[in-house]
Amino acid sequence: MNKNLVLAIGLFLLGAISQSRGDGFIVVERPIYVPPTHFPFAPLEVTSHQVNVKIDGQVAITSIDQEFYNPNDQRLEGFYMFPVPKGAHIDKFSMEIGGKTVDAELLPADKARGIYEDIVRKMRDPALLEYAGRDLFKVRVFPIEPHSRKPIKISYTELLHSDAGTVTYLYPLSTEKFSARPIKNLSVKIELKSAEPLASIYSPSHKVEIKRDGANRAVIGYESKDEKPNTDFQLVYSSDTRDVGLKLITYKPDGDDGYFLLLAAPTVSKETKPAAKDVVFVADTSGSMAGAKLQQAQKALRFCVENLNADDRFEIVRFSTEAEPLFRELVPADSDHRKRANGFIDEFKPIGGTAIADALQSALKVRPDKTDHPFVVIFLTDGLPTVGTRNPDEIVANIKKASGARIFSFGIGSDVNTQLLDQIAEGTRAFSQYVLANEDLELKVSNFYTRIKEPALTNLKLDLGGSVRTSKMYPTDLPDLFKGDQLVVAGRYTGAGDVEAKLSGNAGGREQTFTYKLHFDDRKTTDDYVPRLWATRRVGFLLDEIRIHGETTELRDETTELARKYGIVTPYTAYLIVEDEDRRRVPMADRSMQSMSADSATRAEVAKAWGGFKDKKEGDDGVANARSQNAFKFAQQAPASIASGASESLRGFAAAAPAGTPAAARLGQYAQQSRFVSGRAFFQNGNQWIDSNAQNTAKRQRVQFNSEEYFNLLTKHPEAGPWLALGQNVVLKLDDTVYEIAE
C-alpha cells in the first residue's frame, strides 16, 4: 500500500487581507518497494527561495523562484499543493516546473479540507491543519529525479487591501515545520511605487533594508542564509501629501482594552534642502582605549565629519583626565574646519583617566542659548567616570538641565556603566548602544549617523484628542524624527471612535503642527502582531524600572503575566514565570516551564542570575543586560526583538557560567521552545505544547489525536487549526474547556 510523505518546499501564496498563512508543499507518492539500503526517504531540500515583488499603488505582482533538491536514490513523483489564504484576491496565476508551464487545479475549501485531513490521518502529522477552510491549488509533479534539482517558478497578481490608507502586503514564509534543512539562500525584494508621496514603510515581521528613491518610490529588501523561516513576511505602507504622514493600526479584542501602533514618517523629496543641525562629537581617549578601539573610533569620527551637511555646525571634544575641545565653539562644516577636525582626530593618543562629566559639560557649553538648530551630542566611551564628578545620579541631573540636547551614547567594551549611559540617553530623548570588543565600532557609528543625518521634525509632541483614552505608550518621550526614518509608537486605548490627532514639532526652525483624523476600532482582531509588539516594549520598560530603580511586587507581577501571555521568554522572564507558578501552586502538568520547575539546581542558577540582573551595572553581564533591554524597549518587530533580547541575556549568563560547566548546562535549559501562534503563546514541554491560557480552568476533556472526535473538534472550532498544527500533543483552551490532545 502506498504511503504519503509530506515534504514542504516553500510558501507561495500571499494573503494581503487574511493574517493566516498559506504554505506550499509536495505530497510524494512513496514506491511500494523501498530498497533497504535507503530507508526512510530523506526529505526534499529547499536550496534557494527568491521572492521579487512589484507593487504599484495597491496592485502587487509577486514572482517566486525556488529550487528543490532530491537527495534520495530514487525517482519521486507526487502533487505540489498550496493553500489560498482566506480573502486573498488572486489573479493571473501562472506556474512553471522545470521550465515548462503547467496548469494548476483550483479546489474549493470543502474539497481541500478533505485532502488536508486525509494527509493528516495517513501521516499522523497535524501540521497541515492550519490550512483547513482554504481553497487549494494542486498540480502533479513528475518526475523528481534522484540527486537532481527541480526549479519551480510562480507568478501571481493580486489587489492589496487598504485599511484607512494603510496597505498591507503579506508573503507566507513560515516553513519551519516543513523544511528538512535551513534554506541556503532566501531573499525578498519589493519595488514599491505610489502615485502620492510614500510615508510609512514598516515591516512588523522582519528587519528590512529600506532605500527610498525620491518621494514616490522605494525598494525594500530582506536577505538571509541558512535560515528556517518561521514568521510570515509582512509589509505595511502608506502615502501622504503632507510633510509627515501618520497612520494608525489597532487591535481590539472583545472584553479588553485595545492596542495600537502609530506610524509616523516624513515624506521624502530629492529637492528638499537638509535642515541644519549642531553636532558635538565627544571621544574618549583614555588609556584603556589603546589599540583597535581608538583606531575604530577615529575612523568613525572621520566618517561623521565628512558627512556633515553644508549648513551644519560642529565641535569635537577629546577627553581623558581632562576635556579638550577643538574649537571651543560651534563652527561651520566648511572644508577648512573639516580639515582641522581630521587633523585633531589623527592626533588622538590613549592616555590618562576618564573625565566623563567634564567632557559632557564641555559639549553642552557650546550650545547657544537661542537656536533653532537641533543639538546632538555623539558620545563614545569605554570606561567608568574616574576623574571629576563620579556620582552617576549627579552626572545625570546636571545633564538634564540642558533641555533640548540629545546625547547618543556608544559604550565600547564591557567596562562601562550601562545604567549611567542609559539614563543619560533616556533623560535627553536619545538612546544608547553597546559595542562589544569583537564588533565593528566604525560600522555601528556610521550607520547611526547616516540615520540622523537629516532632521525632519524635532521636539515632538503628540495630542490625541476626543473620547478615546490612550495609555502606556512607548516610547514614553517621543524622539526626534529624521528623513528616511520613522517613529513607531505602541500603546493601549479605551473606548472607540474618531480622533483628531495633532503632531507638532520644529521643522527647519519653524514650529509646525500636522492634524490627522484617526479611527480607533471597537473590535478588530486581524493584526495580532500589534499587542505582542506593545507587550515586548512594555516588558522592556518594566525590566528597566526593576534594573534601575529596584524591584516591586507590582513590577514583577506585570512582567510575569505579560511574558507568559505573549511568549516573551528570556532567562529572567523564565525565572519569574517559574516562581509565579510555584507560588500559585499550578499543577505541574499545566506549568509553562516544567523542566525548570522540577530542577532545583537550574532554578538556583537562574535565581542567582536574576539577582545579578538587578545589581550589575558593568561587566560582560551588565552590558548584556543593557543590550537585552534595548532590544525590548526599542522593538520594531516582536519576534526578532525577543530573540535578540534572549540571546543577549544568554551571553550575559555565559560570562557567569562558562560553556561546558554544569551551571551552563542547567542555565541552557531555560531556553525551551515557545511559539506565538494566532494571538496565543504556547510553551513546549517535551513533546507537548501547552496553551498559556490553559491554567486555572476546571473543565477539562481528553481527546485522542487523529480520532473522529479530534476532527470533529476542528470542525466545531476552525480557528483552532493553527494551534492544533503545533503537534500531536497539545493542551488547548477553547471557550471554557481545556482540551488535552494526546497520541
Where are these regions (language model features)?
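Short glycine-aromatic motifs
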Residues: 88, 196-198, 208, 364, ...
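Pro/Ser/Thr/Gly-rich intrinsically disordered low-complexity regions
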Residues: 4-7, 12, 16-52, 96, ...
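Exposed acidic/Ser/Thr-rich ligand/metal-binding surfaces
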Residues: 65, 133-137, 141-155, 164-168, ...
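Subset of Sec-pathway N-terminal targeting signals
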Residues: 19-261, 493, 504, 550-584, ...
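Hydrophobic beta-strand segments of well-ordered beta-sheets in folded domains
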Residues: 185-189, 377, 406-407, 728-730
